[in-house]
């Protein structure tokens, strides 16, 4: 029987990003792709944040991040805020450090009781870091488009790694006027992205405000993607089209992103909302090897 049978979980959302938080620090088990997909079939989520025993002194947990297709991700900003909310709520802490595949993340209570800040680390721009399948010296724009050659619908995205690959397409019109459900999977799986990519449409309202919509790698169309908001804010600042502190509007809500000048770390501040707590029924994993 799966060690997840009868185990408790918490369902949350980070401004619309559907999150399951699963604390396995008391269980020596690594969730399998089949188990992750089984959970998603009963408790729909965009990402599942699994807390495992920390590997280093001074950290709260090692976080494994699963997409609903069973694949793993290196980063999920909205999910991290949900984890932080749960941990702080139980321990009374106001700051903590967590381990992820993308590195150590420092987190703390935000400027209001329902706000949490996650230091998402330093963005990477090298074509091999993102990664891309071929060399681009300047990743502020790369050659990629959807639509006719002489009149592309989307073209020339900025690419950034926030521990996971992001492509940001700049648009002049409302981000909701584009058929992202159609273009998203094509771009996510484009050969230029050997590890696939998160695809974002972004409209710069002014230097302090950006609206965006994201097709999330391994999860599909989402109401919010925190790492995509970070990547978009950084990409806009690299192009000198936005300030380093920006207000981001996503379908599910609002985030504040700061690309801190003194050390190039990206700070994301937003809410985390509790929905319900439950336990996994053993039958859910009956067909899982």
UniProtKB/Swiss-Prot annotation:
InterPro entries: DAP_epimerase_AS, DAP_epimerase_DapF. It is found in: Cytoplasm. One of its GO terms (biological process) is lysine biosynthetic process via diaminopimelate. Gene3D superfamilies: Diaminopimelate Epimerase, Chain A, domain 1 (3.10.310.10). The record marks 166, 216 as: Could be important to modulate the pK values of the two catalytic cysteine residues. This is Diaminopimelate epimerase. Catalyzes the stereoinversion of LL-2,6-diaminopimelate (L,L-DAP) to meso-diaminopimelate (meso-DAP), a precursor of L-lysine and an essential component of the bacterial peptidoglycan. It comes from the Bacteria. Its EC number is 5.1.1.7. The gene is dapF. The keyword Amino-acid biosynthesis applies. NCBIfam families: DapF. It comes from Bradyrhizobium sp. (strain ORS 278). The active site is at 76 (proton donor), 225 (proton acceptor). Pathway: Amino-acid biosynthesis; L-lysine biosynthesis via DAP pathway; DL-2,6-diaminopimelate from LL-2,6-diaminopimelate: step 1/1. Pfam families: DAP_epimerase. GO terms for cellular component: cytosol. Substrate binds at residues 17, 47, 67, 77-78, 164, 198, 216-217, 226-227. It catalyses: (2S,6S)-2,6-diaminopimelate = meso-2,6-diaminopimelate. HAMAP family: DAP_epimerase. Belongs to the diaminopimelate epimerase family.
